[in-house]
């Protein structure tokens, strides 16, 4: 297909609270080099898609407070390709905003939608996979998501059950989706993996812009009606007023729950490249390849570790000696103004840090 009709939407609106205290409201994780690669998450994502989508067809959707950070980190981004959300309303409104914007430019648009915080370990294979998926949706009115063969019963990811029985892991062609399950508990995740029918849901989607518009109007009319007329407001003096009003009245809902779980157009493309959704400290620990013999992962200047296993130690400033003794499956996260010592289990951490919402901790958020 003609790549001039291929677009990419990078969703970069999250606040990254599960990566606190390194990720803060003023500069969340998508704008940080949490994985110590030399590039921020959003920079890596942008560069990854340059291999398959024309530069002028890459759009970024983020909170309006992050305008300057995005333009600083992605200076090649055309200003009109930065879509600013006045409020966070989850992925369905974000996708509606981008879809209506793209359709005004190009009614023939084919779109890949991606989060901004993924780790991919084979950029060439990734580009080939996206290109193949674009080719597949060209001849089919389907909504495609990329599925990843699970390597562990991870409770931080959603799961997709593919049609095709217990041999689906051998398949390298798109498959119709049977069920979606959002973040099961560990026991259920183990059952899923044992069946050989389930994949991790990568959260990367591909579709024709016109097809997702029609499907969202069918299943999420309360969202899409907020953006009707956007094509007339775009580029005019009422543009900001229109979007503020749309987001004020818009329902907070994900595209998975609002559309993908309901439509019979959901298909999954199994991928072979290495993938990680770095949404939590626990997920970062899981993808770090360099661990010591006791399973400790360290990103710090100097450490003294004894009688300790399965621990993640992170000190972004790398100015201190971090000494750890007698811990198991913990994380030690040290910044200039906050020190966190906590079990690295994501659910426990999320409950624990809810306390930073108290007024006396405002400056640390």
Regions found by a protein language model. Give the residues of each.
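Conserved N-terminal catalytic core of the sugar/cofactor nucleotidyltransferase
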Residues: 1-10, 17-25, 36-115, 121-131, ...
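Left-handed beta-helix
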Residues: 2-5, 210-365
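Short beta-strand segments
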Residues: 10-12, 61, 112-115, 145-149, ...
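Residue-level signal for inorganic ion chemistry
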Residues: 42, 98, 117, 160, ...
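General beta-strand structural signal in soluble alpha/beta enzymes
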Residues: 60, 83-84, 113, 146, ...
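A residue-level structural signature of the nucleotidyltransferase/glycosyltransferase Rossmann-like core
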Residues: 111, 204-205, 276, 331
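Conserved core of the sugar-phosphate nucleotidyltransferase
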Residues: 123-244, 267, 318, 343
